[in-house]
């Protein structure tokens, strides 16, 4: 069962991931994110880098469908919430692996130069690509950057995702990973 805090955070994340705002998560939503990243990185329209990034962006989505035993390629918001609220789909034992996989996906997608850290600029790009209000990017970065060294490591990203996906504490630092989930609306 989801607490109200978790329901709000997960609904907010669903709205962010729903790039075309049709109320469903679909492969096109994830491909659109890849296209935006490719444009920022100025990858040629037919480059292997562009294709690799598109494949990377779809990997997590395919895994979501697999985890949900879905034959249909669309995920509705109620299905999304059920995924995270059901102890049969994501139980405490599998949550750790799931959080790592999700955090690593986002981390690798936005570590644009491959230096194994997320810089402030790369973090800002994540906000731009997902149309998240930039007003909250600085506080989000500061809260996730646990050691205040001006960069986000994979372990810091994992901790943030653990907070965001699993914590019912509205003050958890990782809740800010995608901006202010409590008052902001995904664009």
Each PLM stretch: what is its role?
Residues 23-27, 75, 116-118, 150-152:
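Glycine-aliphatic tripeptides that mark coil-to-beta-strand junctions in extracellular
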Residues 41-48, 82-92, 119-122:
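Boundary/linker elements of alpha-helical solenoid repeat scaffolds
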């Amino acid at each position: 069962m989801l607490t109200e805090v978790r329901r709000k955070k997960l609904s907010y994340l669903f709205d962010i991931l729903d790039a075309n705002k049709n109320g469903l998560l679909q492969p096109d939503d994830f491909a659109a994110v890849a296209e935006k990243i490719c444009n920022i990185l100025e990858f040629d329209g037919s480059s292997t880098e562009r294709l690799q990034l598109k494949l990377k962006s779809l990997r997590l989505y395919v895994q979501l469908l697999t985890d949900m035993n879905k034959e249909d390629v669309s995920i509705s918001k109620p299905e999304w919430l059920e995924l995270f609220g059901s102890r049969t789909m994501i139980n405490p034992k599998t949550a750790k692996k799931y959080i790592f996989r999700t955090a690593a996906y986002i981390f690798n997608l936005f570590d644009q130069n491959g230096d194994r850290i997320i810089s402030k600029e790369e973090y800002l790009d994540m906000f731009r690509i997902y149309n998240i209000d930039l007003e909250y990017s600085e506080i989000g970065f500061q809260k996730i950057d646990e050691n205040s060294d001006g960069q986000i490591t994979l372990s810091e990203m994992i901790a943030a995702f653990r907070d965001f996906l699993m914590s019912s504490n509205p003050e958890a630092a990782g809740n800010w990973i995608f901006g202010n989930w409590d008052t902001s609306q995904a664009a």
